Amino acid sequence: MHYVTSKRNSLLALAVFSALSLTSSVYAADYVMPDMTVSGVREGQSTEVDSTSVVKPLGGIADQEQSAGLLGAKDALDTPFTSMTTTRQSLDYFGTPAKGPTDMLSLNPSVRDSSSSLYNDISIRGFKINGHGMYLNGIPGMLDQQHAADVYIDKATVISGPNIGIVGTPNRESAAGTVEFTSKRAQVKPNTDITLAYLGGSSMKEVVDIGRRFHNNRYGIRIMADNIHGNTAIKGENIKGHDFFVNIDQKTANSKTNLLVGYNYINQHASPYTFGFDNSLTTLPSAPDANRTYKTSYSYNQFDNWIVTLNHEQKLNNHMTAFFNGGYHREDWFGYIDGSPKIINANGDYTIKMTNYTLGITSKYAGVGIKGKFKTGSLKHDYVVNVDRHWYEGFGGNVPTWGNNGSIIATGNIYTHALDGSQYYLHNRVEGGSPWSSTQIVNGWHVSDTVSTKNDKWQLLVGLHGHRTTISKKDGSKNSYNGINPTYAIIYKVNPNISVYASHSESFMSGQTVGSAYANRGEVLDPNKTKQNEVGVKIKNGKLLHTLSLFEIKQANYNVDSNNYYRRYGEQKDRGVEYTVAGSVSPKLDIIGGFTYLDAKQALNGKQVNGTAKWSSTMALVYKPNTKLSIIGRAQYMGKATIINEKFNVPSHITFDLGANYDTKISGTPVTFNAMLHNVFGKNYWLPMASSNNLLLGQPRTFVMSATMHL
């Protein structure tokens, strides 16, 4: 389903109209959080603080309180794995027009960018993940894999490595880790924020964000909408889209509820994605100009998404709480004519085989459970029991009446910018629904207990997750399998500011869905087992949190065969070291970043996993010389990687971003100005993707700026 232009324009009008009728102020509660005391802070900053602990936000761009899935919100020192929570402010500061949420996630050194303006993909510790494998308000399967909406995002938490034992049952393998977004709620201070943003090229974005609370702060409503349009900083690329989200929450002494309803629509023309390389090539061509597209003007991706999430908690007594989490997501990729350039010689000539390929998914989730506390002698127990079901239907297939299933070939050259797509005009474009391809039903259960000694000096986490999955495919086949996934961990608190931990986790779920760049696109790969071991230490120094960890992950390896089918190929073993730091060095300086060393090997041949660099690092700084001005900077480094089983070396690269944020008043109205120059030196570079022989072209130098009125 998609809106016509008049309906798209009405979204912002509806949000503005709603602002005129909203009054009162606030109490916000998270769907898995304990009772909270909230202080009024300018929108975009972290505002929720646990009244029962000393947990405070780590400056403005990170938070020491982190969502740990079904375990609820926890102090970072009490989580036995590498994790990081970034706030809305980090997205406002560092988000690019092309990638949005990806830039928020990639502040975490565990995360490596694998995205373009068309897909918001990442990898964590050498394993890929897209929106379908992420969580929204604790619910799996609610996000799309394409250019993602971000107007509703308040926080993002990344837990590195497979952690199915502490989250709701997904429908697919999540070896990379757990990524969870939390939606904005109405805050203590009512907000009416109107933003006008320039996104590079001739593209613009208008945003409305309104929050109010009612009935002695019991009920809250947050309305968020945006409109995006224009030619981007990449010459030849055009984007049109809009998002509209409403978040409603309530809280009493015995219950709390959160409902998020959203819709987003995008129409992108000539948006860049991957480059492939012909087998005849003996050297990797240098990266071409990133300021232009290498696709034909008629290539496009048009899709929309409906998203609904519901979370409810009901206090049964002083020691027990029942909870429900439910969600619905419909993704309709009804317009698709596209293909990826394949470079065929050292001169930079390339071809594109175009396909007319529509896709769709319907994902539904429901989970109920009980959580609570009890004691056995001097030991404290914090337990969770949960059962859930995940329904997933996939739709997709080439439209056989167009292009003879990919025979249309566009030709061009990455250096001379020659491009011929004239064969397209011999064929008619077809849009519409997609044929059914598969149905997957996953029934899951979860039991965990965190046992703590006096003063939480020692903590032991023991958890089991089980599920039964049934997959029905269009070829008539029907397969079922069962999986039991243990999670266990131990934490020792040296003192209140230092913790040492060790953990083991396993995951056994359906394989990933093959992407559109491969001949078996849309196929759900067979299930496989993932195991991770991790040891680490966390140190809190004032408002600065340090984490140092060593990890090992084993999982099935994937590769591309000579017919461009993405298949399982032996085992992948990743070993590495991570260091993360987040928080405030001083009242005037915030810092977030770290580094990862990753030794990812293919067990069958001992070679480096395709598209996986050994070294990567990210570091972002926010300097606040006074209360009005913030100077923002970020550096991102990616070390050398290899592709096609070490045939080509992908050069290392480093990029820099620089910007500023300024708060002032105009005629008595508070206004926030933001300006950012991404890729300051305009570097052209290849960006590798984990377990892939294709490469992305890095984003060009892009200047963005915005003005937000706080009415």
Regions found by a protein language model. Give the residues of each.
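A beta-strand signature from Gram-negative outer-membrane beta-barrel systems
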Residues: D150-D193
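Transmembrane beta-barrel wall of Gram-negative outer-membrane proteins
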Residues: N191-D193, Y198-Y273, Y298-N317
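Structural signature of Gram-negative outer-membrane beta-barrels, strongest in the C-terminal barrel
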Residues: I361, K380-Y392, S434-Q555, S584-S586, ...
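Gram-negative outer-membrane beta-barrel transporters
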Residues: N455-K457, E552-K554, R568-N645, F681-N684, ...
